Amino acid sequence: MVKLGCSFSGKPGKEAGDQDGAAMDSVPLISPLDVSQLQPSFSDQVVINTQTEYQLTSADQPKKFADLEGQRLACSHSEEGRRLPTARMIAFAMALLGCVLIMYKAIWYDQFTCPDGFLLRHKICTPLTLEMYYTEMDPERHRSILAAIGAYPLSRKHGTEMPAVWGNNYRTAKEEHKGTTPAAMAVSTAAAAAAAEGTEPSGKSLDTREKEDPQKAEGVPSQPPK
């Protein structure tokens, strides 16, 4: 506490006129404080400290509850973390199996549908010989089966030619069939019947005809009638 009316000289019994004349002598000083006044009584503060401790514990309780919730969430996250790798592994296995099936369908299964000696190309079974023949050509033309068929050499003849004798007989029979008339058909029918009976159309037997014309029977043409 500050006590007024004190001076350096330590003489409190001066008059007011002397205080106005000597300003330095009237400067107040801070008196020393008693230590007992600075220390409060502990009897009332015990309850306050107890209440303060109780309030601090009550303030810490939500944090503890929050920690419990965090632990529960951490436990649940750990369980989910254990489940997620299993689901990912199953999904990865399914995707891998699908890729294997697609590759099997595209590479091997389609080739089994074509017979031996054929190869599936552009969803069409093409002969292996044709495929080998056109592998040396331009890949642009090789991609199209129609272009390959169009470029196939036409000089090759896929079949045996008919012999000349049989071809001539076939042509003659065809021409006779086209140019036959009812009368010619009747004559040819009678000649066929006579040949079956062993006689000529005139009614004579073949033996009688040979006796009358021995030269004709020997294969020498007879003289024409005059």
Curated annotation (Swiss-Prot):
UniProt topological domain (Extracellular) ranges: 1-88
UniProt-listed GO biological process terms: clathrin coat assembly; positive regulation of endocytosis; postsynaptic neurotransmitter receptor internalization
Membrane topology type: Single-pass membrane protein
Transmembrane annotation, as ranges: 89-109
Key words of the record: Cell membrane, Cytoplasmic vesicle, Endocytosis, Membrane, Transmembrane, Transmembrane helix
Bias kind Basic and acidic residues: ranges: 206-216
The keyword Transmembrane helix is assigned to this record: yes
Subcellular location: Cytoplasmic vesicle membrane; Cell membrane
Cross-referenced Pfam families: Calcyon
Gene Ontology terms for molecular function: clathrin light chain binding
Composition bias type Low complexity, residue spans: 183-196
Annotated tissue distribution: Most abundant in brain. Also expressed in testis and ovary and, at much lower levels, in kidney and heart.
Disrupted gene: phenotype observed: Mice display impaired clathrin assembly and clathrin-mediated endocytosis. Transgenic mice with up-regulated forebrain expression of Caly display a range of abnormal behaviors including spontaneous hyperactivity, reduced anxiety and/or impaired harm avoidance.
InterPro entries recorded: NSG
Cytoplasmic topological domain: 110-226
Stretches the record annotates as Disordered: 1-21, 177-226
One Gene Ontology cellular component annotation held by this UniProt entry: plasma membrane
Keyword Transmembrane attached: yes
Major localization listed first in the record, in broad terms: membrane
Binding partners and assembly: Interacts with CLTA.
Functional summary from the UniProt entry: Interacts with clathrin light chain A and stimulates clathrin self-assembly and clathrin-mediated endocytosis.
Family membership noted in the UniProt record: Belongs to the NSG family.
Name of the protein this chain belongs to: Neuron-specific vesicular protein calcyon
Organism: Mus musculus (Mouse)
Lineage, broadest ranks: Eukaryota, Metazoa, Chordata, Craniata, Vertebrata
